A protein has these predicted regions:
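Conserved N-terminal substructure of TIR/SEFIR domains
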Residues: 1-71, 75-79, 85-90, 94-99, ...
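Conserved beta-strand/loop subsegment of P-loop NTPase cores
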Residues: 103-106
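Short acidic-hydrophobic, aromatic-tinged amphipathic segments that line or gate anion-handling sites
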Residues: 131-137
Length: 163
């Protein structure tokens, strides 16, 4: 059985470069821990939803990168993507919460924490989760805090404690 993993959830147009950098750093810092990020982890021809659900079954941490346009990103018809039941970011976070995966919101580049009334009903809990901030100017400091938080969850899971 593979060790518990870390899942990186993000919007490509919002925090894509941060997600890529974070995945690289997670892989370096935790070489024996699987790190799931859609572009690198889903094989060609594989069903996205199934791959995401499978990954979340083995993850103990989901890092939700929330950038300045995370809440307001729209689809081609101008509808807010978070209101689309088929939105993958919504699916990832909702599924993680349903499976009691630790969700760590990371507010990127000055993004504000979403308020409950801004979120779909099944994501309201996200507004109550303590978030970390991450910015370009303080990246090393912010990233070290995030890595320490992830390490604590991984260690508590290895010790058999609840996340």
């Amino acid at each position: 059985m593979p060790p518990p993993g870390v899942f990186v959830s993000y919007r490509r147009e919002d925090t894509g470069p941060y997600a890529r950098l974070l995945k690289e750093h997670l892989t370096e810092r935790f070489p024996n821990v699987p790190v799931f990020m859609d572009l690198d982890s889903i094989e060609v021809g594989v069903d996205f939803a199934e791959a995401i659900e499978d990954a979340l079954c083995s993850c103990v941490v989901l890092v939700a990168l929330i950038g300045p346009v995370w809440l307001t990103t729209t689809d081609d018809e101008g509808r807010r993507r978070l209101d689309d039941p088929d939105d993958y970011v919504l699916f990832e976070i909702r599924t993680a919460m349903e499976r009691c995966v630790r969700v760590i919101p990371v507010l990127v580049d000055g993004a504000k924490a979403p308020r409950q009334q801004q979120l779909p009903a099944h994501l309201c809990k996200l507004a109550r989760l303590n978030a970390l901030e991450m910015s370009y100017g303080r990246f090393e400091y912010d990233e070290s805090r995030l890595m320490a938080a992830i390490r604590r969850v991984l260690e508590s899971t290895a010790d058999g404690k609840s996340t």
